[in-house]
């Protein structure tokens, strides 16, 4: 009879205060959890990171690339690579996957590594650029027309042309520079740049050099021509002009000399 009173009191409290009964139920369930810790909800995500290495890589057309995707997920559910490039061998290890990309020819492509952990998906990205440095940079001998020199520079077998910058340098200063970003072709190309340069007296005997530069999102590839010195002797016009001036000067001197000689002879004959 003594134990019946507390039991009746418990039922009375549960009926009067429903929260007490639910709290007791939750306390009982927690006590039944393993190791005495509350059970994690099924929708809880595990914090983790995903990284790609290298994040940027540049190769010559037709070469292969190796990309490494690492993550901090203790038990990844899935790991995959999304890219328009053709994939080769795939190697896997604890916390990493290595992907091989074959025959890279597109000038710029993206590769996304996706990792799913506890129902949540994260990703990282690498950019792959294909390029071909200029095979040669050739500066033709300047041609003088009137008072201007025509400079012509040839850049051969370069890709992608849209990222090429051609610069003409005379001595220590840049006399012309052009970016070819308007060209969007996907093949190797030859580029010719023509520029007219009005040279003054101080510009002679100084070298002219043609520089070609590819700017590939962090990678810079350069090539240059052999220097060529501006000289008056390259143009027949200045030579002819100089010869005519010398001949005229000689003629004047001969005339003056002959007149002076005749005057001297006349003075002697009078004496």
UniProtKB/Swiss-Prot annotation:
GO molecular function: integrin binding
Ranges of the Cytoplasmic topological domain: 262-271
Keyword presence, Repeat: yes
Localization, UniProt: Cell membrane
Gene Ontology biological process: cell adhesion; cell-cell adhesion
Predominant localisation class: membrane
Pfam families hit by this protein: ICAM_N
Listed GO CC annotations: extracellular region; membrane; plasma membrane
Entry comment describing in which tissues the protein is expressed: Erythrocytes.
Superkingdom of origin: Eukaryota
Its biological purpose: ICAM proteins are ligands for the leukocyte adhesion protein LFA-1 (integrin alpha-L/beta-2). ICAM4 is also a ligand for alpha-4/beta-1 and alpha-V integrins.
Similarity comment: family membership: Belongs to the immunoglobulin superfamily. ICAM family.
Residue stretches making up the Ig-like C2-type domain: 62-124, 146-217
Annotated glycan sites: 68, 78, 190, 223
PANTHER family: INTERCELLULAR ADHESION MOLECULE, INTERCELLULAR ADHESION MOLECULE 4
Protein's organism: Homo sapiens (Human)
Post-translational modification as stated in the protein's UniProt record: N- and O-glycosylated.
Gene: ICAM4
Record bears the keyword Membrane: yes
Name this protein carries in UniProt: Intercellular adhesion molecule 4
Membrane topology note: Single-pass type I membrane protein
Signal peptide: 1-22
The entry's keywords: Blood group antigen, Cell adhesion, Cell membrane, Disulfide bond, Glycoprotein, Immunoglobulin domain, Membrane, Repeat, Secreted, Signal, Transmembrane, Transmembrane helix
Cysteines engaged in disulfide bonds, as pairs: 69-113, 69-117, 73-117, 153-210
Chain ranges on the Extracellular side, renumbered to this chain: 23-240
